[in-house]
Amino acid sequence: MTDKTIAFSLLDLAPIPEGSSAREAFSHSLDLARLAEKRGYHRYWLAEHHNMTGIASAATSVLIGYLAANTTTLHLGSGGVMLPNHSPLVIAEQFGTLNTLYPGRIDLGLGRAPGSDQRTMMALRRHMSGDIDNFPRDVAELVDWFDARDPNPHVRPVPGYGEKIPVWLLGSSLYSAQLAAQLGLPFAFASHFAPDMLFQALHLYRSNFKPSARLEKPYAMVCINIIAADSNRDAEFLFTSMQQAFVKLRRGETGQLPPPIQNMDQFWSPSEQYGVQQALSMSLVGDKAKVRHGLQSILRETDADEIMVNGQIFDHQARLHSFELAMDVKEELLG
């Protein structure tokens, strides 16, 4: 359906199902990373979140190191590190260390959102407005260090300086798309939970892109959810765990990933249903035939260079099977 090569990648939040633990979530992430490597997923990213009892990927760089040490060829990275939470120097050192240990296998995806609530921001010892205002400068500083330039002649990250680590900008708004275009960096859009501005952002990024030493032409990744099973009914049942989690988030409730339920109408209100369905509208839920049809439409409409797949499923084996089926569909469509 397309002549260009389209990579297929995987996003992991290290979800903690109800009754489980962070330790089990890390074990499950390792299973998933090994599956991703075996099946040919191009890259495997982990997302930074804080103070969320159902997500274990807070110390993103540490978890990347754990997975890299237990795989061989898989590209691993952050999807993303929320840069306003951190000193650029510390991030350069952390990812420089990772790239020194696992050369050519590490990506740094950067986000501008806090990935946390206001109390957690204070616990992270940061001042939100100032740090967000500094985001373009902080990104440029990281890129300069990785490209062996000296934004500060008295400070260098060791390791990190000159490491040529791939840097991505992530976002769900026009801001990140514009900045990625201006800096000549690859861009990933978080349509798996905030799809509203997807097409505007892709157009803005592509039409304003300035070639750089890192990237000659725009490269856009689109992140979607895929919940695949052997039948549509089974997939829709598994999907209710994510739907419940999104409802609870909107209610201001915390908790681990809930088990699936038979009837969402007994769980959410009509307004909650509308909001969650909008947020999760870039979700392909069904058997291979249904997922294939949906993926064809997304590729045609977005002209994405890369698809990143997310999927939070309560049962670990069902989650592994879903990512197996997703790759089956990719191979059938794109080789």
UniProtKB/Swiss-Prot annotation:
Keywords: Oxidoreductase
InterPro entries: Bact_Lucif_Oxidored, CmoO-like, Luciferase-like_dom, Luciferase-like_sf
Example of a GO MF term: oxidoreductase activity, acting on paired donors, with incorporation or reduction of molecular oxygen
SUPFAM superfamilies documented for this protein: Bacterial luciferase-like
Keyword Oxidoreductase: yes
Coiled coil spans: none
SS bond list: none
The keyword Oxidoreductase belongs to this UniProt entry's keyword annotation: yes
One annotated Gene Ontology cellular component of this protein: cytosol
NCBIfam families found in the cross-reference section: oxido_grp_1, PRK10508.1
Family of this protein: To bacterial alkanal monooxygenase alpha and beta chains.
Name of the protein this chain belongs to: Luciferase-like monooxygenase
Native organism: Escherichia coli (strain K12)
Gene name, Swiss-Prot/TrEMBL: yhbW
